[in-house]
Every structure is written in structure tokens, then in C-alpha cells.
Design a protein with these regions (language model features):
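Short, Lys/Arg-enriched N-terminal segments with co-localized hydrophobic residues
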Residues: 1-14
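Alpha-helix termination/capping residues and helix-transition junctions
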Residues: 14, 70-71, 165
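Asp-based phosphoryl-transfer active-site loop
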Residues: 17-32
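Active-site phosphate-binding/coordination module
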Residues: 37-141
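Short, solvent-exposed beta-strand edge segments and adjacent coil->beta transition regions
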Residues: 91-94, 166-170
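Acidic, His- and aromatic-enriched active-site or binding-groove loops in soluble protein domains
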Residues: 135-159
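Alpha-helix-centered segments that form part of catalytic cores
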Residues: 155-169
Length: 170
């Protein structure tokens, strides 16, 4: 985690690691979902020392890319809770695991009306407008600006998927 690089109590640590994988929420990002200058500096310092630094997150690449662009030299991302490993500079996917459309249709048919639908399809994130408009009802107020900036907001995400089912990353 990033805190190993900027720990105030112990100072900078000398570790023989080659990869730093940082979770985003409550690790690399503060409570306002911002990437702090201290963490950007720590990540860039590690990259300058020849380390590979990646975000490892449950988010899709469309919701991670703005943060990656803030860290000079960050190239890779582990997204969708491990469903995808992407070279963000070339778009090459080293790993891309999806859930087949029939399984997603089965789940979606039973979940409609009970959950906030968020579909990760082809590196894009989709959700229903009513969900994004009511993020607070889901305990996700802090995410609303991120969703509005990085999601494809549609009238009804379940209906969109059912009309044109595709493999889903998450």
C-alpha cells in the first residue's frame, strides 16, 4: 500500500520490491476520492526508482484512467476486482475475464429493482440515471461526481443489457 512509502512515523522504507499495487478507495484516495499530492509523489518516486506501480481496484478502466493520468509513468491497472489487467498506454489486456451474457441475464432479471445496476462492458461502465441521481440512497454520495464523469449513464441499465447482452467484466 502507498502508506509504506510515506509513513510519517517510520520515514521512508527501503524495501526490495518490484511492484506496488495500490487499492484506490481508503488507500491511495482520501475520503473525498482525491489522489493526494503526497501519494502522487510517492508513486512517482517509486516509478523513478524502476518500480512498477499499479492501481488495483474494483473499478473499471473508465473510472480509473483519470487517476492514472495524474501519476507520471503509471502504465498498468488491475481493474474489475482482478477481472482485467491492462496496459493503459497501449490498451493491451494481459488478462480479461468476463461473465457470460446468459449468466448475467439470469442475475439481472432477479436483481432488477433491488440493486444499483453497474455493468462493466468493453472497458466502459454503465448505470441507470435514477441510480446515479440517488447515490446517497446507496451510501455512495462521494462517488457521484466520479460516476457522472466516467460512467455511461443510461435510462435503464438492466433494459439496455437485456436488449443487447454482452460479456460483462463485473
Amino acid at each position: 500500500a502507498v502508506y509504506l512509502l510515506v509513513c510519517k512515523k517510520h520515514g521512508e522504507r527501503k524495501m526490495k520490491y518490484k511492484l506496488l499495487a495500490a487499492d484506490m478507495d481508503a488507500t491511495a484516495l482520501n475520503s473525498k476520492k482525491e489522489l493526494t499530492p503526497a501519494n502522487v509523489n510517492a508513486m512517482e518516486k517509486a516509478i523513478a526508482q524502476g518500480k512498477t506501480v499499479v492501481f488495483s481496484t474494483g473499478r473499471s478502466i473508465s473510472l480509473v484512467k483519470p487517476y492514472i493520468d495524474m501519476v507520471r509513468g503509471m502504465r498498468y491497472a488491475v481493474t474489475g476486482s482482478g477481472a482485467s489487467v491492462i496496459d493503459t498506454q497501449t490498451g493491451k489486456k494481459f488478462l480479461y475475464e468476463t461473465i457470460d451474457p446468459e449468466t448475467v441475464k439470469y442475475i439481472a432479471a432477479r436483481a432488477a429493482g433491488y440493486v444499483m445496476p453497474i455493468f462493466f462492458i468493453d472497458d466502459k461502465t454503465y448505470s441507470s440515471a435514477w441510480c446515479v441521481d440517488n447515490c446517497a440512497d446507496f451510501g455512495l454520495s462521494a462517488y457521484e461526481p466520479i460516476y457522472r464523469k466516467g460512467m455511461n449513464i443510461v435510462d435503464d441499465a438492466f433494459a439496455m443489457f437485456m436488449a443487447d447482452p454482452k460479456p460483462v467484466e463485473k
